[in-house]
Regions:
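Generic, well-ordered alpha-helical scaffold segments in large soluble proteins
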Residues: 41-46, 98, 102, 137, ...
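A helix-coil-helix interface module used to build multimeric assemblies
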Residues: 1-216, 220-231, 294, 307-309, ...
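Active-site-adjacent "gating/activation" loops or surface patches in catalytic cores
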Residues: 223-247, 251
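Short amphipathic alpha-helical segments with heptad-repeat character
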Residues: 135-143, 147-150, 154, 184-187, ...
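Long, amphipathic alpha-helical stalk/connector segments used for oligomerization, subunit docking
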Residues: 309, 313-400, 404
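Glycine-rich anion/phosphate-binding loop at the beta-strand->alpha-helix junction
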Residues: 193, 246-332
Length: 456
């Protein structure tokens, strides 16, 4: 193993521990593990087809032996495959040769050893392996970690539902909301993208060198190969069958998947920046951890480093995922090899995503609302009530309500409760409406924000 301090990529160096869960999935070992699963399940599937007499049904013992290799593929096994590849200079062929050698002592498999990789092009094995890897990453890592963020934010939205906050549009004071409602907005966005990620299909094919079952049909013309291959992809592997391909599966679903991850990342980048700003305004304080240093020269500093780290890593993720989404669906004629090296970087895009998720969650866990700062901003900005006053004036037919409030408040300093009180008292509107306006404060002018936050 490489010493993390000597690693070229920070994913395998400084951040190695944070992406540990992805290593068995996206490493070269992970790709080999998936290839072994596909090759052996394909052999098992061939043995279930009565018209392929040369591969009779396997005994329970043989099936158990095959499953053991699938489930227990080890780093030592991967090293043995690499040793074979040193001679073949072909990674998929090395898997085939290793499997033949590995099962030389299992009579039923040894007798059918030439049906390992039968009628397959390398891409038949690779595309299914990549689909299995992405599916595993989604189920084992991405969805659970995103669910953790959504759960944390939902709790914060409920807890802070009634804490009033001055909004800012264009960076300027705007109609109040609550802290909880602003967080609820993010929760709703993430929930939608979570569902999109959940619904993503992972496509696969095993239809030969150019997608037409050419070799299959020559060898066994009486087999319904399309049905057989569909059942293999969908039932044996749990993927979605793609019936129309060239040599490679076109990777459109990969682009969809990576774009779905990018949308999640973009939402979190947006929220990272907002929280960074709220910390700067004093709306949130950060819990201080003993022993930590905020600046090498300014001892007082408590910086929003987790949100900055998250923003940076999610930006890196989106750069990689964006390239994958744009490049992978493009291949010259029936195939070129440009996708091969690019696909080895799937784990990089997902890895930076996971780093960004983890940093964001760390930051959330350090946040504490600062009610005093929130209240002070609201209390210093009574011009926020110009909106409700002119709206009520419109209801009761007062002439030029917007213009009157604009003249009273726009660009003016020192709009106090007293100034607004005098203005309201001068209005020719029903006494009940006037009384309600006189009772209104910036902190109370939050509409349905609390209700909306609690409902998320």
């Amino acid at each position: 193993m490489i010493n993390p301090i000597a690693a070229l990529s920070p994913l395998d160096g400084r951040y190695a521990k944070s992406v540990e869960a992805l290593r068995p999935i996206f490493s070269e070992y992970g790709l080999m593990r998936a290839r072994v699963k596909v090759e052996l399940n394909w052999l098992k599937a061939l043995a279930t087809e009565p018209k392929i007499a040369e591969v009779p049904a396997f005994s329970d013992f043989t099936l158990a032996e095959i499953d053991k290799v699938i489930e227990n593929f080890s780093l030592e096994d991967a090293a043995a495959v690499k040793a074979i590849e040193a001679t073949t200079n072909h990674d998929v062929k090395a898997i085939e040769y290793w499997l033949k050698e590995r099962f030389s002592g299992v009579p039923e498999v040894a007798a059918a050893s030439e049906f390992i990789h039968f009628a397959c092009t390398s891409e038949d094995i690779n595309n299914l392996s990549h689909a299995l890897m992405l599916q595993e990453a989604r189920e084992a890592v991405l969805l659970p970690k995103l669910a953790e963020i959504i759960e944390k934010l939902t709790g914060m939205a409920h807890e802070l539902a009634a804490v009033p906050m001055m909004s800012r549009t264009h960076g300027q004071p705007a109609t109040p909301s609550t802290l909880g409602k602003e967080i609820a907005n993010v929760v709703y966005r993430l929930q939608r993208q979570f569902k999109n990620l959940q619904a993503q299909e992972f496509l696969g094919k095993i239809n030969g060198a150019v997608g037409n079952y050419n070799a299959h049909m020559v060898a066994y013309p009486d087999v319904d190969w399309e049905t057989h291959c569909r059942n293999f992809v969908e039932i044996s592997l749990g993927l979605t069958f793609n019936p129309y391909t060239i040599q490679i599966e076109p990777h459109d679903y990969m682009a969809e998947f990576f774009q779905a991850i990018s949308r999640v990342n973009t939402i979190l980048i947006d929220f990272n920046r907002d929280v960074w700003g709220y910390i700067s305004l004093g709306y949130f304080k950060q819990k201080v951890k003993a022993g930590e240093v905020g600046s090498s020269t300014m001892p007082h500093k408590v910086n929003p480093i987790d949100f900055e780290n998250s923003e940076g890593n999610l930006g890196m993720a989106n750069a990689v995922l964006g390239f994958l989404s744009e490049k992978l669906p493009i291949s010259r004629w029936q195939r070129d090899l440009t996708d091969s090296t690019v696909l080895r970087n799937m784990g990089v895009g997902v890895g930076y995503t996971v780093l960004g998720f983890a940093a964001h969650l760390r930051g959330l866990n350090k946040l504490e609302p600062n009610p005093a700062a929130l209240a002070a901003d609201l209390d210093a900005t009574w011009e926020l009530l110009a909106e409700p006053i002119q709206t009520v004036m419109r209801r009761y037919g007062v002439a030029n309500p917007y213009e009157k409030l604009k003249d009273l408040t726009r660009g003016k300093d020192g709009i106090t409760p007293e100034v607004l009180k005098l203005f309201i008292e001068s209005l020719e509107i029903p006494a009940e409406a006037k009384a309600k306006l006189l009772e209104l404060t910036p902190a109370l002018y939050v509409g349905k924000a609390e209700e909306l936050a609690k409902r998320i």
